[in-house]
Amino acid sequence: MPAHKLLEIAEQLNIHEGVARARKQDVIFALLKVLTRHGEGVFADGVLEILPDGFGFLRAAEASYLAGPDDTYISPSQIRRFNLRTGDHLSGRIRFPKDGERYFALSIVDTINGEPLEASKNKILFENLTPLFPRKRFRLERADGSTEDITGRILDLMAPQGKGQRALIVSPPKAGKTMLMQQVATAITTNHPEVHLIVLLIDERPEEVTEMQRTVRGEVISSTFDEPAARHVQVAEMVIERAKRLIEHKKDVVILLDSITRLARAYNNVVPSSGKVLTGGVDANALHRPKRFFGAARNVEEGGSLTIIATALIDTGSKMDEVIYEEFKGTGNCELHLNRRIAEKRVYPAIDINRSGTRREDLLIESDLLQKIWILRKLLHPMDEIAAIEFVLDKMKNTKSNDEFFGSMKR
């Protein structure tokens, strides 16, 4: 809810003290205090973050899991009783803080991850689930003939995305990676509404966060460039734990991460020094946790999948960024390369077709379509990167779907 709406509600309830020019969370806290004092049944929900001391708090996705005075306290006894873990989504009734307490506490737990309490008792832990190659494809083609749809159509042919894909978008600065991410997010939410989409923006500009929130129908979690590295790390850990809990409930989750390079830089600043420093100033232990984040993407045999599509920065002039990219290069099962030369010519999407592709694409695409794609690749291979993408874009602009595209190629 916008801040001005909260202030209007506060005015209706005659709350004036400490509300004007206060943070959004402080206004919510003041409203909850009045409502619970009057004996109203107040319900809260949020994503659990368990702290090292054993207790936890419900964090709000709208606030990008930032700690605030309106967070709900979860006691260690509740965590043990319901076998809760970081990332569980809880909802229930809250009570007013007792003397000496600072936070509202959850008195009655109604649901865990949207299911009754009994249903979440026998869930298999994420680490014990069996990872497989992706076998179900995301259709990114919307068949509406728009210029935005062409991005999805090219990806469907040249770098198909499956449920459980671990994809890396390799991009130099100003090559259109943010626009590409927006178009992929829109295509997934349009064609696959059952998928839980999370867009994770690390070290991004605030105006890009707002634009993403307004264009994408999904969770947008962010930590902007003016936040400390510890905050970037906390946000990333919360997002991956949330995704793991959803997969334990056999859901399909997609995380769009922009960018894994900045996340690795944040871990490099936070991790205690091991004394071993790689080229570019990267600590030897710093890349273990971002690799664990990226490595969580998998198709699960027992049901559910976690897809991570992450951007990696190259040609930034920083040796550290090159080292981070080299470390992640072989870990994904799909790579999409963006080219600065194509972007400078104002040709979008600036995809280097000959360098992009998906491993084991035969598991995602039917054999007759795969043969057509291979013939197209043979045709494009002798061309340079600009000629190849211009050829494909020219043919696609005259057709509304990929089936029609291959029909025109036959002629």
From Swiss-Prot:
GO annotation, biological process: DNA-templated transcription termination
Entry's EC annotation: 3.6.4.-
Keyword Cell wall biogenesis/degradation in annotation: no
Transmembrane segments: none
Binding annotation for ATP: G162, K163, G164, Q165, R166, A167, K174, A175, G176, K177, T178, M179, R205
Domain named Rho RNA-BD: residues: 41-116
A single GO molecular function term of this UniProt record: ATP hydrolysis activity
Gene3D superfamilies given in the database record: 1.10.720.10, Nucleic acid-binding proteins, P-loop containing nucleotide triphosphate hydrolases
GO cellular component: cytosol
Keywords of this entry: ATP-binding, Helicase, Hydrolase, Nucleotide-binding, RNA-binding, Transcription, Transcription regulation, Transcription termination
Subunit structure: Homohexamer. The homohexamer assembles into an open ring structure.
HAMAP family with a match to the protein in the record: Rho (MF_01884)
Function (record text): Facilitates transcription termination by a mechanism that involves Rho binding to the nascent RNA, activation of Rho's RNA-dependent ATPase activity, and release of the mRNA from the DNA template.
Family from the record: Belongs to the Rho family.
Protein name: Transcription termination factor Rho
Taxonomic source organism: Xylella fastidiosa (strain 9a5c)
Lineage of producing organism: Bacteria, Pseudomonadati, Pseudomonadota, Gammaproteobacteria, Lysobacterales
